[in-house]
């Protein structure tokens, strides 16, 4: 327990919280190029083939990013926009690819929740 004099001299140091998406360097988004596009299986008890891409940013760092939605058109050398946000059942995947930006197309035939998947309003 510090004395009042010690608190006046030094004050309390607040804890520094570790970032959940360190590769973005505090930015909301980052532009990158796909190095690898593949499917991986989730942890127990879930079962699926989840789509993910390995993305290299301009500064050279590589991250694993999840491709949300049904179907995608990404391949190697595609330019993508990456945001933070983990996928709970995929270990090591802490980023999401933003649909409908750069080379990533929006999800086809999407009627609800379109803004998350880069889909235009149907006529």
Swiss-Prot record:
The gene is rpsL. One of its GO terms (biological process) is translation. Signal peptide: none annotated. GO terms for cellular component: small ribosomal subunit. This is Small ribosomal subunit protein uS12. Keywords: Methylation, Ribonucleoprotein, Ribosomal protein, RNA-binding, rRNA-binding, tRNA-binding. With S4 and S5 plays an important role in translational accuracy. Interacts with and stabilizes bases of the 16S rRNA that are involved in tRNA selection in the A site and with the mRNA backbone. Located at the interface of the 30S and 50S subunits, it traverses the body of the 30S subunit contacting proteins on the other side and probably holding the rRNA structure together. The combined cluster of proteins S8, S12 and S17 appears to hold together the shoulder and platform of the 30S subunit. The keyword tRNA-binding applies. It comes from Orientia tsutsugamushi (strain Boryong). GO terms for molecular function: rRNA binding; structural constituent of ribosome; tRNA binding. The modification 3-methylthioaspartic acid is found at residue 89. NCBIfam families: rpsL_bact. PANTHER family: 30S RIBOSOMAL PROTEIN S12 FAMILY MEMBER.
